[in-house]
Design a protein with these regions (language model features):
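Hydrophobic anchor at the beta1->P-loop junction of P-loop NTPases
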Residues: 5
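The conserved Walker
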Residues: 9
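Conserved glycine(s) of the Walker
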Residues: 12
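Hydrophobic positions on the alpha1 helix immediately C-terminal to the Walker A/P-loop
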Residues: 16
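N-terminal phosphate/diphosphate-binding loop that engages ATP/GTP or pyrophosphate donors
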Residues: 21-97
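Intrinsically disordered, low-complexity terminal tails and inter-domain linkers enriched
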Residues: 42-57, 119-208, 237-239
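Phosphate-binding/switch loop-helix module in NTP-utilizing enzymes
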Residues: 93-129, 201-210, 215, 221
Protein backbone atom coordinates (compact mmCIF):
# COMPACT_ATOMS: atom_id res chain seq x y z
CA UNK A 1 0.00 0.00 0.00
CA UNK A 2 1.18 3.51 -0.79
CA UNK A 3 0.48 6.14 1.86
CA UNK A 4 0.71 9.77 0.78
CA UNK A 5 1.24 11.96 3.84
CA UNK A 6 0.06 15.48 3.14
CA UNK A 7 -1.25 18.64 4.81
CA UNK A 8 -0.48 22.31 5.24
CA UNK A 9 3.10 23.50 5.67
CA UNK A 10 4.76 23.34 9.10
CA UNK A 11 1.99 21.47 10.88
CA UNK A 12 4.32 18.77 12.21
CA UNK A 13 4.24 16.17 9.41
CA UNK A 14 7.90 15.25 9.76
CA UNK A 15 7.83 15.13 13.56
CA UNK A 16 4.75 12.91 13.33
CA UNK A 17 6.54 10.73 10.76
CA UNK A 18 9.64 10.42 12.95
CA UNK A 19 7.49 9.20 15.84
CA UNK A 20 5.66 6.80 13.53
CA UNK A 21 8.98 5.38 12.30
CA UNK A 22 10.08 4.86 15.89
CA UNK A 23 6.83 3.00 16.61
CA UNK A 24 7.28 0.84 13.52
CA UNK A 25 10.82 -0.01 14.57
CA UNK A 26 9.67 -0.84 18.09
CA UNK A 27 7.07 -3.20 16.62
CA UNK A 28 9.71 -5.01 14.58
CA UNK A 29 9.24 -3.39 11.18
CA UNK A 30 12.38 -2.28 9.38
CA UNK A 31 12.10 1.34 8.21
CA UNK A 32 14.29 2.50 5.33
CA UNK A 33 14.48 5.75 3.39
CA UNK A 34 14.75 9.33 4.55
CA UNK A 35 13.02 11.77 6.88
CA UNK A 36 13.58 15.51 6.63
CA UNK A 37 13.48 17.30 10.00
CA UNK A 38 13.79 21.05 9.99
CA UNK A 39 16.51 23.10 11.64
CA UNK A 40 14.61 25.23 14.15
CA UNK A 41 15.76 27.97 16.51
CA UNK A 42 13.78 30.14 18.95
CA UNK A 43 12.74 33.47 17.50
CA UNK A 44 14.25 36.55 19.15
CA UNK A 45 11.81 38.06 21.61
CA UNK A 46 9.53 40.52 19.86
CA UNK A 47 10.23 39.19 16.36
CA UNK A 48 6.97 38.37 14.58
CA UNK A 49 6.47 34.77 13.54
CA UNK A 50 5.30 33.37 10.25
CA UNK A 51 2.08 31.57 9.45
CA UNK A 52 3.19 28.56 11.44
CA UNK A 53 5.85 27.85 14.02
CA UNK A 54 7.32 24.62 15.29
CA UNK A 55 4.65 24.51 17.99
CA UNK A 56 1.97 26.31 15.97
CA UNK A 57 2.55 29.56 17.85
CA UNK A 58 5.33 31.07 15.76
CA UNK A 59 7.91 30.95 18.57
CA UNK A 60 10.48 29.17 16.39
CA UNK A 61 11.85 29.89 12.95
CA UNK A 62 13.06 27.39 10.37
CA UNK A 63 16.64 27.86 9.16
CA UNK A 64 17.07 24.78 7.03
CA UNK A 65 16.27 21.13 6.42
CA UNK A 66 18.27 18.03 7.28
CA UNK A 67 17.92 14.58 5.78
CA UNK A 68 18.24 11.61 8.12
CA UNK A 69 19.04 8.39 6.24
CA UNK A 70 17.25 5.33 7.56
CA UNK A 71 17.86 2.83 8.97
CA UNK A 72 21.38 3.94 9.94
CA UNK A 73 20.47 7.43 11.19
CA UNK A 74 23.14 9.38 9.29
CA UNK A 75 22.30 13.09 9.19
CA UNK A 76 23.00 15.34 6.18
CA UNK A 77 22.37 19.07 5.95
CA UNK A 78 20.14 19.12 2.88
CA UNK A 79 18.77 22.62 2.40
CA UNK A 80 19.01 26.13 3.78
CA UNK A 81 16.71 29.07 3.74
CA UNK A 82 17.60 30.99 0.61
CA UNK A 83 18.60 34.22 2.37
CA UNK A 84 20.89 32.34 4.76
CA UNK A 85 22.45 30.25 2.00
CA UNK A 86 23.35 33.43 0.10
CA UNK A 87 25.34 34.66 3.11
CA UNK A 88 27.15 31.39 3.78
CA UNK A 89 30.46 30.39 2.20
CA UNK A 90 30.08 26.83 3.49
CA UNK A 91 26.83 26.13 1.65
CA UNK A 92 26.57 26.18 -2.12
CA UNK A 93 23.16 26.03 -3.75
CA UNK A 94 22.96 23.36 -6.42
CA UNK A 95 22.00 23.86 -10.03
CA UNK A 96 18.93 21.64 -9.75
CA UNK A 97 17.24 23.73 -7.06
CA UNK A 98 18.26 26.97 -8.75
CA UNK A 99 16.90 25.87 -12.14
CA UNK A 100 13.59 24.82 -10.59
CA UNK A 101 13.37 28.10 -8.62
CA UNK A 102 12.69 26.30 -5.37
CA UNK A 103 11.93 28.14 -2.16
CA UNK A 104 14.88 26.45 -0.42
CA UNK A 105 18.51 26.38 -1.52
CA UNK A 106 19.41 22.69 -1.91
CA UNK A 107 22.91 21.33 -2.39
CA UNK A 108 23.48 19.09 -5.42
CA UNK A 109 26.05 17.25 -3.31
CA UNK A 110 23.46 16.50 -0.64
CA UNK A 111 21.04 15.30 -3.33
CA UNK A 112 23.76 12.94 -4.61
CA UNK A 113 24.36 11.56 -1.12
CA UNK A 114 20.68 10.84 -0.55
CA UNK A 115 20.39 9.33 -4.03
CA UNK A 116 23.34 7.04 -3.27
CA UNK A 117 21.47 5.85 -0.19
CA UNK A 118 18.31 5.14 -2.18
CA UNK A 119 20.39 3.37 -4.85
CA UNK A 120 21.57 0.94 -2.18
CA UNK A 121 17.99 0.39 -1.03
CA UNK A 122 16.86 -0.10 -4.62
CA UNK A 123 19.46 -2.79 -5.24
CA UNK A 124 18.41 -4.63 -2.09
CA UNK A 125 14.86 -4.64 -3.47
CA UNK A 126 16.13 -5.83 -6.90
CA UNK A 127 15.11 -2.52 -8.48
CA UNK A 128 17.38 -0.76 -10.94
CA UNK A 129 18.47 2.68 -9.67
CA UNK A 130 17.57 5.62 -11.88
CA UNK A 131 21.13 6.00 -13.20
CA UNK A 132 21.73 2.31 -13.97
CA UNK A 133 20.98 2.49 -17.69
CA UNK A 134 17.89 2.37 -19.86
CA UNK A 135 18.60 -1.15 -21.09
CA UNK A 136 17.62 -2.68 -17.75
CA UNK A 137 14.29 -4.51 -18.05
CA UNK A 138 12.94 -3.26 -14.72
CA UNK A 139 13.74 0.34 -15.53
CA UNK A 140 12.34 0.05 -19.03
CA UNK A 141 9.00 -1.27 -17.80
CA UNK A 142 8.77 1.43 -15.15
CA UNK A 143 9.46 4.07 -17.77
CA UNK A 144 6.69 2.65 -19.96
CA UNK A 145 4.15 2.75 -17.14
CA UNK A 146 5.21 6.08 -15.62
CA UNK A 147 3.93 9.39 -17.07
CA UNK A 148 6.75 11.68 -18.11
CA UNK A 149 7.47 14.84 -16.13
CA UNK A 150 8.87 18.08 -17.46
CA UNK A 151 12.69 17.85 -17.16
CA UNK A 152 15.16 20.57 -16.29
CA UNK A 153 17.58 21.77 -18.96
CA UNK A 154 16.25 19.51 -21.71
CA UNK A 155 16.15 16.44 -19.52
CA UNK A 156 19.49 16.84 -17.78
CA UNK A 157 19.57 16.77 -13.99
CA UNK A 158 23.14 17.91 -13.22
CA UNK A 159 24.88 14.82 -11.80
CA UNK A 160 27.28 14.67 -8.88
CA UNK A 161 29.17 11.41 -8.46
CA UNK A 162 28.27 9.65 -5.23
CA UNK A 163 31.93 8.95 -4.51
CA UNK A 164 32.76 12.64 -4.85
CA UNK A 165 29.82 13.57 -2.67
CA UNK A 166 30.94 11.27 0.10
CA UNK A 167 34.53 12.57 0.05
CA UNK A 168 34.12 16.29 -0.50
CA UNK A 169 30.88 17.40 1.08
CA UNK A 170 31.16 19.54 4.22
CA UNK A 171 27.49 18.81 4.84
CA UNK A 172 27.74 15.27 6.17
CA UNK A 173 26.90 14.93 9.83
CA UNK A 174 26.11 12.13 12.23
CA UNK A 175 23.95 12.26 15.31
CA UNK A 176 27.09 12.74 17.41
CA UNK A 177 28.80 15.21 15.09
CA UNK A 178 29.98 18.75 15.62
CA UNK A 179 27.81 21.36 17.27
CA UNK A 180 26.52 23.03 14.11
CA UNK A 181 23.10 24.60 13.67
CA UNK A 182 21.78 21.29 12.34
CA UNK A 183 23.23 19.27 15.21
CA UNK A 184 21.96 21.76 17.77
CA UNK A 185 18.49 21.59 16.29
CA UNK A 186 18.61 17.79 16.36
CA UNK A 187 19.63 17.75 20.02
CA UNK A 188 16.92 20.23 20.93
CA UNK A 189 14.23 18.20 19.22
CA UNK A 190 15.51 14.80 20.29
CA UNK A 191 16.33 11.91 17.99
CA UNK A 192 13.51 9.40 18.33
CA UNK A 193 14.88 7.03 15.67
CA UNK A 194 17.28 4.36 16.81
CA UNK A 195 20.49 4.05 14.81
CA UNK A 196 20.97 0.81 12.88
CA UNK A 197 23.78 -0.67 10.80
CA UNK A 198 24.33 1.07 7.48
CA UNK A 199 22.10 -0.16 4.69
CA UNK A 200 25.13 -1.13 2.61
CA UNK A 201 26.55 -3.24 5.45
CA UNK A 202 23.55 -5.33 6.46
CA UNK A 203 20.69 -6.76 4.47
CA UNK A 204 17.39 -5.12 5.27
CA UNK A 205 14.78 -7.30 6.91
CA UNK A 206 11.96 -8.30 4.55
CA UNK A 207 8.64 -6.45 4.54
CA UNK A 208 10.33 -3.12 5.27
CA UNK A 209 8.49 0.20 5.18
CA UNK A 210 9.90 2.64 2.63
CA UNK A 211 9.79 6.28 3.77
CA UNK A 212 10.41 9.26 1.46
CA UNK A 213 10.26 12.72 3.05
CA UNK A 214 9.59 14.45 0.80
CA UNK A 215 8.70 14.47 -2.88
CA UNK A 216 8.50 18.04 -4.12
CA UNK A 217 8.43 19.97 -7.37
CA UNK A 218 11.95 18.85 -8.24
CA UNK A 219 10.88 15.21 -8.26
CA UNK A 220 7.25 15.26 -9.36
CA UNK A 221 7.36 18.07 -11.92
CA UNK A 222 10.91 17.70 -13.26
CA UNK A 223 11.91 14.07 -12.53
CA UNK A 224 15.08 15.37 -10.86
CA UNK A 225 16.13 15.50 -7.22
CA UNK A 226 15.68 12.18 -5.42
CA UNK A 227 15.53 10.15 -8.62
CA UNK A 228 16.43 6.85 -6.96
CA UNK A 229 13.56 7.26 -4.49
CA UNK A 230 11.33 7.78 -7.52
CA UNK A 231 12.74 4.61 -9.09
CA UNK A 232 11.75 2.53 -6.07
CA UNK A 233 8.28 4.03 -5.93
CA UNK A 234 7.82 3.72 -9.70
CA UNK A 235 8.41 -0.04 -9.39
CA UNK A 236 5.39 -0.45 -7.13
CA UNK A 237 5.17 -2.85 -4.17
CA UNK A 238 7.92 -5.47 -3.83
CA UNK A 239 8.64 -8.22 -1.30
CA UNK A 240 11.26 -5.91 0.21
CA UNK A 241 9.00 -2.84 0.25
CA UNK A 242 5.35 -3.94 0.19
CA UNK A 243 4.33 -0.59 1.65
CA UNK A 244 5.64 2.96 1.40
CA UNK A 245 5.00 6.39 2.89
CA UNK A 246 5.78 9.47 0.80
CA UNK A 247 5.35 13.03 2.04
CA UNK A 248 3.78 15.19 -0.66
CA UNK A 249 2.54 18.76 -0.41
CA UNK A 250 -1.16 19.23 -1.15
CA UNK A 251 -0.54 21.08 -4.42
CA UNK A 252 1.36 18.06 -5.80
CA UNK A 253 -0.98 15.35 -4.55
CA UNK A 254 -2.72 14.84 -7.90
CA UNK A 255 0.63 14.57 -9.66
CA UNK A 256 1.85 11.96 -7.17
CA UNK A 257 -1.28 9.89 -7.60
CA UNK A 258 -1.08 10.12 -11.38
CA UNK A 259 2.50 8.88 -11.32
CA UNK A 260 2.36 6.12 -8.73
CA UNK A 261 -1.16 4.69 -8.74
CA UNK A 262 -0.71 2.71 -12.01
CA UNK A 263 1.73 0.48 -10.08
CA UNK A 264 0.48 0.78 -6.50
CA UNK A 265 -3.24 0.96 -7.00
CA UNK A 266 -5.27 3.65 -5.27
CA UNK A 267 -3.07 5.54 -2.83
CA UNK A 268 -4.20 6.12 0.74
CA UNK A 269 -4.00 9.83 1.57
CA UNK A 270 -3.28 10.45 5.24
CA UNK A 271 -2.61 13.35 7.58
CA UNK A 272 -0.48 13.48 10.74
CA UNK A 273 -3.09 12.14 13.15
CA UNK A 274 -3.76 9.13 15.39
CA UNK A 275 -6.08 7.41 12.93
CA UNK A 276 -3.38 7.43 10.25
CA UNK A 277 -0.77 6.23 12.72
CA UNK A 278 -2.90 3.25 13.71
CA UNK A 279 -3.66 2.42 10.07
CA UNK A 280 0.02 2.38 9.10
CA UNK A 281 1.01 0.28 12.10
CA UNK A 282 -1.73 -2.25 11.42
CA UNK A 283 -0.83 -2.40 7.73
CA UNK A 284 2.81 -3.08 8.57
CA UNK A 285 1.86 -5.74 11.10
CA UNK A 286 -0.37 -7.51 8.59
CA UNK A 287 2.49 -7.54 6.07
CA UNK A 288 4.57 -9.57 8.48
CA UNK A 289 6.81 -6.78 9.68
CA UNK A 290 6.34 -7.57 13.36
CA UNK A 291 8.37 -10.55 14.51
Amino acid sequence: MLFLLTGDVQIGKTRWLENLCASLQAAGTCVAGVVAPGQWVPRPEGQPGGKHGFDGAGRFEKLGIDNVLLPQGKRIEFARRRDLAAKSKAFTEGTQAKAAKLGWAISDTAIAQVNAHFATLAKQASIAPADSGADDSTTTQAEVDTPAAAPLDNGVCPPVAAETAAKTSPLVQTNTGESTAAATAAKAGGNVLAAAPAANETRLAPHAMLVVDELGRLELLHSCGLTNALAILDAGPTPQFPHAIAVVRETLLDEARRRFEPRWGKATVIGPDDAARNLVLETARAAGGAH
